[in-house]
Amino acid sequence: MASTDDPAGQRPSRAEAIVAHAEQSISEDAIVAAARERAVDIGAGAVTPAVGALLSVLARLTEAKAVVEVGTGAGVSGLWLLSGMREDGVLTTIDVEPEHQRIAKQAFIEAGIGPSRTRLISGRAQEVLTRLADESYDLVFIDGDPADQPQFVVEGVRLLRPGGAIVVHRAALGGRAGDAAANDAEVSAVREAARLIAEDERLTPVLVPLGDGLLVAARD
């Protein structure tokens, strides 16, 4: 009898196998793993290991000194971002849940990250982003409510310095964003965010099939 790879008796598609291999190839240290466990405990989303590793690579490639993150969670993505940033880099991370930020702050302390390297802002990202300075950030990571992605993208692009990059997580919505039959409000918002990026001549975008889809765009 031929072996199968899931309880339903169906082998994963080639694309699924590649993504699974990408995820399994990343090992997380004990501090990130502990933060991931806390994220589960408090019901906060957390990027997958491969998404985290890509964030670290992008931070390194952009030589990021100033990074903005929408959606602190338990600090998993923040730890990955900080691992790729310059040693004097500062992560500004925004979340509407103060408890999430308290837990993330503990993760940063456990990782030996000094308080001068993080700026945790509790509040609605829609409001906080508007108060940040134009063209002052090397990398913007958006991991907030997909329904708010268009506004986050508009503000995020405004914050980017030339040569910086914007990363939008949950750009695929489990495949619904590419399903012509799907047209609910969340899908429409994600498509609008993608359109805004695609039509901005300063940006060079690519959709990366990791996590729930990462829309990455570099600014000229």
UniProtKB/Swiss-Prot annotation:
GO terms for biological process: methylation. Keywords: Methyltransferase, S-adenosyl-L-methionine, Transferase. SUPFAM superfamilies: S-adenosyl-L-methionine-dependent methyltransferases (SSF53335). PROSITE patterns: SAM_OMT_I. InterPro entries: Cation-dep_OMT, SAM-dependent_MTases_sf, SAM_O-MeTrfase. Substrate binds at residue 143. It is an enzyme of class 2 (transferase). Its EC number is 2.1.1.-. GO terms for molecular function: O-methyltransferase activity; S-adenosylmethionine-dependent methyltransferase activity. CDD domains: AdoMet_MTases (cd02440). Belongs to the class I-like SAM-binding methyltransferase superfamily. Cation-dependent O-methyltransferase family. PANTHER family: O-METHYLTRANSFERASE RV1220C-RELATED, O-METHYLTRANSFERASE-RELATED. This is Putative O-methyltransferase Mjls_4009.
